[in-house]
Amino acid sequence: MRIVDRESAEGRRERITLVPETLDDLWHLTYVLEPGDLVAGDTTRRIQRDDDKMRDTGGEREPMWIRIDVNNVEFAKFANRLRVGGDIVDCSREDQLGFHHTFNVEEHDELTVEKVWQVDQLERLEEAVEAAEQPDVAIATVEEGQAHIHTVAQYGVEERASITGTTGKGEYARSRDELFEELAAILRRLDAEAIILAGPGFTKQDALEHIEDNAPEAAEKIQVVDTASVGDRGVHEVLKRGAVDRIQTETRVSKEAELIDELMERIGEGEKAAYGVDEVAEAAEFGAIETLLILDERLREERAGEGDWAVDVNDIIENVEQQGGEVVVFSHEFDPGQQLANLGGIAALLRYRLS
């Protein structure tokens, strides 16, 4: 994420002009933007005309500058874009005022966001800016006859390739070198800044030697990790062991896994923990929260007025921060986020037990 400009607006509002540079940045904006925000930028809009030439075509798209009052935000992950919809409140063409418009925000599109910024939202922007300097990580898990390549992004872990084939004897057997060469070719194409090579047994070491001989530029980026499995399970082992953390100073994935494990351990032992909005709100009032854990989707719903909590989520967050606590927003894309969802979407590690 790149911040282009910041300036004060009316009331407690602030206007920030920014440029999302990666798919991760678009994902971050999903949880920054909310109904009532003002979003502006250059876009195109289909204009209906009355002349005979255009009547049958449904109008043509014209470039214009538009500001909307946001009422809908959707991250279209597989389309690589963020859809931000709302009513037009300012426009370079006055005849478009009041109509609905949707920005299809893609990487490198500049937009200006005006709103009352919550502390956690500004922290999320800062996280996105800092993430631009962190290395991308590819995880290749390998065992005899198969290899899987995943990438770790802030919005989730994504499988990028799966290679399978018989590597035994026989006319139709696929040689190990052939499988290793395809693995090396994929890693070259991904051009990740760091690679973790994992799996059971000695196959990964043989794969590393092949990559060192045939793709030395990729081999320089590799760290080897022992795991009992490959594929999704192998990736989970890599994340849980903190291998990604050693490459990226701090990743959302590994931090959330560590925190949710600590929470579940404390709950199981009846230690300093709270979960569910009622328990957490009470703990926040007493200043007992050391770390607040909240699910991104639940936070968005509550702020948009779509949730069912009887307390204001912003009050909980402000109480925690005023008492020196940490707020961690979990991604629903990861397993730890799913575990948190099962606990009501909000929980806390406490400084002391309340009862």
Curated annotation (Swiss-Prot):
GO terms for molecular function: endonuclease activity; metal ion binding. The keyword RNA-binding does not apply. Its main location: cytoplasm. Gene3D superfamilies: 3.30.1330.30, eRF1 domain 2, Pelota, domain A. One of its GO terms (cellular component) is cytoplasm. Its EC number is 3.1.-.-. It is an enzyme of class 3 (hydrolase). Its cofactor is a divalent metal cation. Monomer. The N-terminal domain has the RNA-binding Sm fold. It harbors the endoribonuclease activity. Belongs to the eukaryotic release factor 1 family. Pelota subfamily. May function in recognizing stalled ribosomes, interact with stem-loop structures in stalled mRNA molecules, and effect endonucleolytic cleavage of the mRNA. May play a role in the release non-functional ribosomes and degradation of damaged mRNAs. Has endoribonuclease activity. This is Protein pelota homolog.
